[in-house]
Amino acid sequence: MKIELVFIPLPGIGHLRPTVKLAKQLIGSENRLSITIIIIPSRFDAGDASACIASLTTLSQDDRLHYESISVAKQPPTSDPDPVPAQVYIEKQKTKVRDAVAARIVDPTRKLAGFVVDMFCSSMIDVANEFGVPCYMVYTSNATFLGTMLHVQQMYDQKKYDVSELENSVTELEFPSLTRPYPVKCLPHILTSKEWLPLSLAQARCFRKMKGILVNTVAELEPHALKMFNINGDDLPQVYPVGPVLHLENGNDDDEKQSEILRWLDEQPSKSVVFLCFGSLGGFTEEQTRETAVALDRSGQRFLWCLRHASPNIKTDRPRDYTNLEEVLPEGFLERTLDRGKVIGWAPQVAVLEKPAIGGFVTHCGWNSILESLWFGVPMVTWPLYAEQKVNAFEMVEELGLAVEIRKYLKGDLFAGEMETVTAEDIERAIRRVMEQDSDVRNNVKEMAEKCHFALMDGGSSKAALEKFIQDVIENMD
């Protein structure tokens, strides 16, 4: 009899890819395991995510990995600056998810063993309970921020403090998942905002009800944060550090622009190019664009810069390419840097990071981007823009010595609609530091890359955690 798990990912590219990759790793580790991935369509036109969903549902090559799409009424584009949060949208799909699962498990050769839900789909634990099976969670960020969220919720429920009342304060707080005090003003908007905090608290309470949490991290990368879950015993779910879960496929090999970028990198000396890329939601204002260009000009470094125009509201609209770079870049910049740099709209990040020419990575600190950089042994400059990225940056710089900060305590959050402009001086300084060839940061990253690779091998910590999860799933079946 097949053991069936139901996966419910969030329909965003940064969540879909690691979830599907994890599902493939699981069925590759246990022959009796079968997985159905419930695809909930994106609320709006999600670009890459929609394309990813389409490719997944048409290219499934393993009969033990099944994709089941549910139908959702397409919502028209909205001008509402604060659309319905993802968690609320997902919760509204419970009935359709329940029906899809019920239709799937009529097969007598399959026994439903549990749900594995995305961190933003935690409300689906209610559906798992209806089927009488355990609910596990995939946490696509890191153990440090997972611990931060749970601690904020615990302090609130125990009436010790309300973190939203400390907004804009210089107060530092102790978090069990961090070794150093953390400045409250650098917590994400979802925790410090009176409007968003209740949703985050409800989410954290739901996390605590999970049977276990699969975290996209490595035991050797976050030993202190993971210790928090070990010493709390029954108060917190079992955590399985199974990372790095990475999507390392290199996209469309026939794309001429992509091929040109990669050919150019092949022509550059080893570790000579600084790569600037800020994720699917990262865009720059004209002022920030000019400051960055001045920094690159003065630094003298070779560079590959993914530049897009900031969206007026990233909750509803993605950044777009600049139509005329010469209008926003300093006069003569493109001509002066023609032989040592490229300004592009988009790049295949993984394919770029694995090139020997890349010597440093200026990143928005999305967790997937951090893991990719560590995997390829590329030291980072942290330039956090939104969500938990300031916590990620703090961990990389202050806790682990794996990155250089663009500047200390960067103000603003793209989700809140405002970001501090970083000066050319700060950017140039950070770029020069990260490109140093024998720095402690570079050596630390090289060592961590080796640990990340070994973690996924036989005898490695992440491989062992994955096997432990499978064992627990089987033991938790009725």
Swiss-Prot record:
Which EC numbers characterise this protein's activity in its record? 2.4.1.-
- Entries under InterPro entries matching the protein: UDP-glycosyltransf_plant, UDP_glucos_trans, UDP_glycos_trans_CS
- Report which superkingdom the organism of origin falls in: Eukaryota
In terms of Gene3D superfamilies, this protein maps to:
Glycogen Phosphorylase B
Task: Tell me which Pfam families the record gives.
Answer: UDPGT
EC top class, as a word: transferase
Q: Does the keyword Calcium apply?
A: no
Q: Which PANTHER family match?
A: GLYCOSYLTRANSFERASE
Per its database record, what is this protein's job? Possesses low quercetin 3-O-glucosyltransferase activity in vitro.
From the Swiss-Prot or TrEMBL record, give the protein name: UDP-glycosyltransferase 71B5
Give the organism the record lists: Arabidopsis thaliana (Mouse-ear cress)
Q: Which gene encodes it?
A: UGT71B5
